[in-house]
Each structure stands twice: as C-alpha cells, then as structure tokens.
From Swiss-Prot:
Protein name: Ribonuclease H
GO MF annotation terms: magnesium ion binding; nucleic acid binding; RNA-DNA hybrid ribonuclease activity
UniProt record similarity statement: Belongs to the RNase H family.
Upper classification of the organism: Bacteria, Pseudomonadati, Pseudomonadota, Gammaproteobacteria, Pseudomonadales
Cofactor stoichiometry and binding remark: Binds 1 Mg(2+) ion per subunit. May bind a second metal ion at a regulatory site, or after substrate binding.
This protein's encoding gene: rnhA
Protein's organism: Ectopseudomonas mendocina (strain ymp) (Pseudomonas mendocina)
GO CC entries: cytoplasm
C-alpha cells in the first residue's frame, strides 16, 4: 500500500465536567473522501472519550488498512506507545500493581490496532490543525447530543 492508500483518522474527545457528559469525534480521510463519526456518553471522562474516538475510527474500517491515526491526547499516545506492552505483561496491572484505568477500552483499542498497520501522530490541540479542529467539533457535537437527550 502506498502512502496515498493510507487512511488518516483524526480523533478527539471532549467532556463537560470530568466526569460528566462527554463526546468523541473521528474524521476519516481516504483519497480525498471524508467520513465523520461522533457519539457520546452521559457520564464519562475525557480520557474515555479520547479512547472511544480512536476505537470508533478503527472499527469503521471494514478491512485491514494502513492507517495514520492523529490525536491531540498525550494519554492515548503514551498509553499505546509506552504503557500498553507492560500492562499486557502484568495482566492489565500498573507498575504499582493497581488495575489499569479504562482497561476495557485499552483492550478494545489494542484489538482494533492489531487489525491494521497503524502509525500514530500527536498534534497539539486547538492550534488550527484542520483535521484535529474538525474532530474537536464532532466530539462537541457528541456532547451536545447527549445533553439534549436528557
């Protein structure tokens, strides 16, 4: 697969209160075609929404793909690149032998990542990066829909 065959997924999570109502957004771009995904949860955390955005973006791919996943979440980046291998070795426990927070979502993300060839890119949030800004708007749409459903 050449770089032009790569799917780029921009992800973001949002939470109004932490915990509180939250939303996630993902923008998938493939050969100039865009697909927008979003959703929310009435009681969640920003970290869970960041993870959900990445999971939803990867689940939306119907076959194994070459993926560049772009996030502004240091939590997701450090988790996937540094912490995850050790958590798995320790049976989903931290270095201090505590259960991993959000283990359900980390396990699902790990499962989805293993279906694809994924490279990860961190971008600073709220700096005008078009894909990240759009993912942020989608995440906030998820929050708004959860709040209006109450």
């Amino acid at each position: 697969m050449s770089e032009t065959d790569e799917v780029v997924i921009y992800t973001d999570g949002a939470c109004k209160g932490n915990p509180g109502p939250g939303g996630w957004g993902a923008l998938l771009v493939y050969k100039g075609v865009e697909k927008e995904l979003w959703g929310g949860d009435p009681s969640t955390t920003n970290n869970r929404m960041e993870l959900m955005a990445a999971i939803a973006g990867l689940i939306a791919l119907t076959r194994p793909c070459s993926v560049k996943l772009v996030t502004d979440s240091q939590y997701v980046m450090k988790g996937i690149q540094e912490w995850l291998p050790n958590w798995k070795k320790r049976g989903w426990k931290t270095a201090s032998k505590e259960p991993v927070k959000n283990a359900d979502l980390w396990q699902k993300l790990d499962e989805e990542v293993n279906r694809h060839q994924v490279s990860w890119q961190w971008v600073r949030g709220h700096t005008g990066h078009p894909g990240n800004e759009r993912a942020d708007q989608l995440a906030n749409r998820g929050v708004d829909e959860v709040r209006s459903a109450r």
